[in-house]
């Protein structure tokens, strides 16, 4: 089994994560863990794995869907609480598209799950109209939303400080 690039010390956590931005019919597919905000589908990069390989693996594990990874949208430096410790996360976000539109429901929401450190995390996957992002729907990291809505074809850098 491969090892996620996720390091914990007594004082902090470091995480290397990749997320996919899947947009179809003016809707974006987001994941929502129970009792948490919406986030972009993805996960921790494993040692010796490319970010594109990680995204393909995560979409297959969580959604049983095959994707193609398109252009790099953003590089994020994200600082947030991980339990009682501060976490410094480097995140890459890519546009992605389904190889087969019939792999997942094309509207509404559906259930799935993931594992983090051998703990099962139940997830809801929801198609959200892009208009709701403009109206303040809470999505993590929120700094990425303006770039998605701008539909610019360039890679951006952002910093998200939640601590």
Residue ranges of predicted features:
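Nudix hydrolase/Nudix homology domain
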Residues: 37-38, 104-105, 110-163
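Acidic, metal-coordinating catalytic segment for phosphate/diphosphate chemistry
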Residues: 1-19
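A short coil-to-beta-strand element that immediately follows conserved catalytic motifs
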Residues: 66-75
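Active-site-adjacent beta-strand/loop module that shapes the phosphate/pyrophosphate-binding cleft
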Residues: 80-110, 147-148
